[in-house]
Design a protein with these regions (language model features):
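C-terminal/domain-edge helix-coil "capping" segments
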Residues: 18-28, 125, 129-167
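Surface-exposed short loop/turn segments
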Residues: 85-145
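Mid-chain, structured segments of secreted extracytoplasmic proteins
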Residues: 65-94
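Sec-dependent N-terminal signal peptides
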Residues: 4-13
Length: 167
């Protein structure tokens, strides 16, 4: 019986370790907002220890618009998580009237496609960073939509975090 409880504790700790964590700032400013504009910035992304991200891209055939396609998976999963909170993630456009923007910034991708990511929340009027969220995602290295699986997982993890923090 004791082994069973240790196993359950291990599973719970693994699940909690993989989720998104607010590491700086607060999301209190988001309360009352209807949406947040989201963009993907891969400019800081490195492959393995310090190789250019392009080496990862060159491992398989990729769609030309893989960033845009990857974000579609993020929006779907994030919005499924936050639907009951009446809050949604939307693409960055000039028509977006929301006050805040989230920039998803992948930092490091390993050989199998797993990614370490920061998501930064900015006040669009002042350009002030109000929060930093950190998480890791599983992935693969040969998907035509390069970050499809990581963006699905990011959508779920960040959506779940926002849902909890918006209560």
């Amino acid at each position: 019986m004791r082994k069973f409880f240790l196993f359950i504790a291990f599973i719970v700790s693994v699940v909690n370790a993989s989720g998104a964590k607010l590491v700086e700032g607060s999301l209190d400013c988001i309360k009352g907002e209807k949406n947040i504009a989201v963009s993907l910035d891969c400019s800081k992304l490195v492959y393995k220890k310090n190789r250019p991200f392009q080496e990862f891209l060159d491992k398989a055939s990729r769609m030309e618009n893989w960033e845009e396609e990857s974000l579609k998976y993020f929006f779907k999963k994030f919005n499924e998580e936050t639907f009951k909170s009446h809050f949604s993630a939307v693409p960055v456009t000039s028509r977006n009237k929301g006050k805040y923007e989230m920039v998803i910034t992948p930092l490091k991708i390993n050989g199998g496609g797993d990614i370490k990511v920061h998501a930064y929340i900015f006040n669009k009027e002042t350009n002030e960073k109000v929060a930093t969220i950190e998480f890791k995602t599983d992935g693969d290295d040969n998907d035509e939509i390069t970050l499809r699986d990581p963006m699905k997982e990011a959508g779920e993890d960040l959506g779940s975090l926002f849902k909890k923090l918006l209560k």
